[in-house]
Amino acid sequence: MADDNEFLAIFECVSRFSGATVQVVIDSIMRMTAVPAMERIARLTDGMPVRVQWAGIPTLEWQKTYGLQQPLVELHERFIEEGRDFWTGYAHVPVVVTASIQQSLLFAQSNEYVWHEVVSAETDDEKRSLLNDSDWRARARSSWENDSLETSFFREPSGMMLDNSENDSDPIVSLGDYAMKLGLHPSDALAEWFLHNGLSSTVSMPPWDQDDDMVIRLTRDPNAVGNINDSGAHGQMFCGSGDSIRLWTDYVCSGKLKIEEAIHSQTGKLANHFGFSDRGEIAVGKRADITVFALEEVEHRAKYKVYDVPNDDGGFTWRWTRDPAPVRLTLCNGIPTFDKDGVTGAMPGEMISPS
């Protein structure tokens, strides 16, 4: 845990560079320390010319129900009243994660530390030994029922999808149905599924219910930054890229947002936030970074695996991806990179810096 002096050193350094941004992720899922964490950041940056992007105001229904949302909304409004250069981050899609026993923080983040022992085991033989061990299974059942967070996915196995078998031994099915078929506790059934389908198999967790009203409010808020998605950094943990278009399919097509509001929040608003004054809107003198699409043609496509990520053995491992939405044309610096025939192969992009 960084102390105040360490944070101050960072903020003082950043304040010397015009256009620089400090990004802060606060905890409104596990330890629920979001409010005191942001109050601390606000105190330490008081009087400094520092732009802070903080993530952010929760947009999940359970976070609203648990009283986590309103105090952060009040902080957001206070920062605006004080004239702080604070930008509130949010996501327009609910959190969807994938659990793995090879590499995953999900079990520990859910207070499911008995299952995390399997993740921490260094070899596949050690993992199999734990999954087969009757004493470990008893502890895992108890932890599943009593220690896992009430808001964790493990409390609702009917929504956990066994949809990524390493060896394709079993069809896609929910953990709840799989446990019922085997006549086992969900924890035992999950252990059996990994043993039968391969230790590199993964489980997709159900999305939490989204607070649409808050998403709409923040999309329209000039001091909020949307379109947050870290799927590019977690190719095997989160769903593949493409969730940005759900702002169109879920909110524009349903009439909850105007198309102009959605597009501005993903283009000009973000360009302005990061200091890219030469792009983000269609105007004379701006870079021609343009996407052309017909809204009725756009869909949020199903995810699937492609094996094109280099691994440490000289081969390739997999990642999630999706088929094109599609859009009709993508221009970068005025040059098509995607058109009716697919990817063009052109790479006209350049390194950019804030202006």
Region locations from a protein language model:
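Divalent metal-coordination and catalytic microenvironments
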Residues: G89, G183, D230, A262, ...
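Hydrophobic alpha-helix feature that most strongly marks membrane-spanning transmembrane helices
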Residues: S15, D46, L195, N223, ...
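Beta-strand segments within the central parallel beta-sheet cores of soluble alpha/beta enzyme folds
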Residues: I26, A55-G56, A191-E192, E261-S265, ...
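Short loop/turn motifs at secondary-structure junctions and domain boundaries
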Residues: D168-S169, A271, R319-R322
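Acidic, glycine-enriched loop/beta-strand segments at the rims
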Residues: S201-D209, V215, K258-E261, A271-K305
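Structured core elements
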Residues: Q23, Q53, W87, N227-I228, ...
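C-terminal cap of metal-dependent C-N hydrolases
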Residues: R217-A224, D243, T291-G342, A346-P348
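Active-site neighborhoods of metal-dependent hydrolases
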Residues: M1-S15, V25-D250, S254-G255
